[in-house]
Amino acid sequence: MKKTVLFLMAMTLLVACSSEEKPFNYRGLPLALSTSQFVDSMKTRGFAVDSAASDSGRTVVFASEAVKYRVLMAFEDEKIKAVQETWRLSTNDSTRQMWQQLRDDLEKELGAWPNCPMLKDDHKVADFDAETGIISVILENTYKPTLTVRYIPKSPRTP
């Protein structure tokens, strides 16, 4: 009897610890960071602020020579509203392949099927509803092949 009670307590503790909510993040950076902390973290990762493309009161755009994408962070006061990664690649096929790979990787990571409101050859959208935010993978091969990954944190629930 004593062993059964200890086993049940251990299982309860294991379940409680494993269901701990992970913060919604962009490439390992929690979106609960303040705007200034996020900017500093991006700078330490080798990104520079593109002041010509940024709006000092609402958005900050980051660029780096080391990667083929730009990152836009939208904010209000010191709170991050969204982070968007935009890839510009040379061919439609490369963006299609990348869209499919990102979609498959997120499906495995989140253990969820995406909502796909648009699934055409050159325009695809996959929305993943994570517990603490929405991740959208968007393909737009119209004038220039463009792939966008958007992270939007959900508002905290009020008790």
Predicted segments with their positions:
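Non-cytosolic coordination micro-motifs
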Residues: 21-55, 88-159
